[in-house]
Amino acid sequence: MRVALGIEYDGSQYFGWQRQAEVDTVQERLEKALSIVANEPIAVHCAGRTDAGVHATGQVVHFETNAIRKETAWTLGVNVNLPDNIAVRWVKVVDDEFHARFTATARRYRYMIYNHQLRPGILRSGVSHYPGDIDESKMHQAAQYLLGEQDFTSFRAVHCQSNTPFRCVHEVNVTRQGMYICVDIKANAFLHHMVRNIVGSLLEVGLGNQSVEWIEQLLALKDRNKAAATAKPNGLYLVDVTYPESYQLPKLSLGPLFMLD
């Protein structure tokens, strides 16, 4: 039987999603909890492997199991065995053709900026603090150059293992709610560090250090060294993964919780 789960986690205490030797990861914690409930070893596959310090409100995973359990066992039962900063949000038995990564048609991330002179105390691991006068309208204007299928070499990590730098950005918006600025971006897929590298460069525009057209120029240059530094990890959230409607997966609010959808 193949089961899909919606997962939420605070990634600030983990060395990323993917299981690694001798460090604490979200995947390892989730697999341990699932294995307890299933009474057999469970291995999960995820929609997107988040880096150290990155969060998720809309991560999707799937796994195979011989165990027959009620839905509450895969939600409440698994949550009892998880640390407080990881939670199952929903469960659904899916067809064998479903794959959390390969049947996904799009991913959506939100990057949360706390724009204030003083750093936050609460939410310090859930937002990235950037002081100074940030013009979010210029960031939004510059971000529109990212739309469509393009070569994102200037915004990929140096050690990115993808075979191609081309990705298709479906939509991107930069909005403000008081002291919070949200960079909301949806694409068919993302390169390693792509969102954080984009945000780092958009911030240069918002702070007035670069022109709106600079983003267009960076895309044309296809050179990571010409773009800005990578933005901090703690403001980044994987908020949604899109699948064909035929799978009828649950739809929940995107989050993070302090955002008004």
From Swiss-Prot:
Specify which residues bind substrate according to the UniProt entry for this protein.
Answer: Y109
Q: What UniProt keywords are attached to this protein's entry?
A: Isomerase, tRNA processing
Gene Ontology BP, a term: tRNA pseudouridine synthesis
What does this protein's UniProt record list under function?
Formation of pseudouridine at positions 38, 39 and 40 in the anticodon stem and loop of transfer RNAs.
UniProt EC number: 5.4.99.12
Q: Which protein family is it in? A: Belongs to the tRNA pseudouridine synthase TruA family.
Q: What class of enzyme is it?
A: isomerase
Q: Which CDD domains match?
A: PseudoU_synth_EcTruA
Q: Catalytic activity annotated for this protein?
A: uridine(38/39/40) in tRNA = pseudouridine(38/39/40) in tRNA
What's a single GO MF annotation on this record?
Answer: RNA binding
Origin superkingdom: Bacteria
- Name the InterPro entries for this protein: PsdUridine_synth_cat_dom_sf, PsdUridine_synth_TruA, PsdUridine_synth_TruA_a/b_dom, PsdUridine_synth_TruA_C, TruA/RsuA/RluB/E/F_N
Which cysteines in this chain are paired by disulphide bridges?
A: none
Q: Where is the active site?
A: D51 (nucleophile)
Q: Where is the signal peptide?
A: none
Q: How does it assemble?
A: Homodimer.
Name of the protein in its database record: tRNA pseudouridine synthase A
